[in-house]
């Protein structure tokens, strides 16, 4: 069983964030250690997934149903998912979400699916991690400094962000940068 800790779903309630800002926020939370896993989304989930995967230290999957959730964690062992909040979320959406979260955190991440494919899947995951380490090697703080600072400030302007972020942050360099955004 994976211990879950809710860092704060209220971090971005005050203002509506774009999926790009959600990507910035997710990258800050994951790279700083303030969160172990991020759940986000947008209308289709695609934009949010692309935004999150634009940052180092983030591996986001697009999850539409429980089997997506289970296979993403077992095969790809990522640290974020993007859900489609508009597309296909009509009747039974609450059931779909319940089952997604049940399957998302079922079993040990990276355990493979089907189980007999665990060795090649883990090998491919290590290869992917190596490719991402090369293609996304820039330091997160340096990436954030090169972005439009108003965009970054907007991503961390949520009412509860500072309280929850600084209470859980484990990376001093990221914490110092976030302080400059006040």
Predicted regions and their residues:
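Single conserved hydrophobic/aromatic residue that forms the stacking wall/gate
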Residues: 1-8, 12
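N-terminal beta-loop-helix "entrance" segment that forms/cooperates
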Residues: 10-25
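Short, well-structured alpha-helical segments in soluble
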Residues: 24-34
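A short, small-residue-rich loop immediately preceding and capping a beta-strand
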Residues: 35-41, 60
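Gly/Ser/Thr-rich loops at beta-strand to alpha-helix junctions
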Residues: 42-47, 88-89
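Short Gly/Thr/Asp-enriched flexible loops that form oxyanion-binding sites at enzyme active sites
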Residues: 47-60, 64-65
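C-terminal binding/interaction regions
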Residues: 70-176, 180-181
């Amino acid at each position: 069983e994976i211990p879950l800790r809710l860092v704060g779903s209220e971090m971005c309630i005050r203002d509506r964030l774009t999926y790009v800002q959600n990507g910035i926020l997710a990258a800050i939370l994951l790279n700083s250690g303030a969160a172990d896993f991020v759940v986000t989304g947008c209308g289709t989930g695609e934009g949010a997934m692309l935004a999150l995967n634009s940052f180092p230290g983030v591996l986001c999957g697009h999850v539409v149903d429980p089997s997506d959730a289970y296979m993403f964690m077992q095969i790809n062992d990522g640290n974020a998912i993007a859900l489609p909040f508009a597309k296909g979320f009509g009747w039974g959406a609450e059931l779909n979400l319940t089952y997604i979260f049940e399957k998302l955190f079922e079993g040990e991440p990276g355990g493979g699916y089907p189980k007999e494919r665990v060795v090649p899947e883990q090998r491919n995951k290590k290869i992917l991690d190596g490719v991402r380490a090369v293609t996304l090697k820039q330091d997160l703080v340096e990436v954030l400094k090169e972005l439009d600072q108003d965009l970054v400030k907007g991503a961390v302007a949520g009412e509860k962000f500072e309280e929850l972020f600084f209470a859980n942050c484990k990376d001093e360099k990221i914490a110092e940068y976030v302080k400059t955004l006040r």
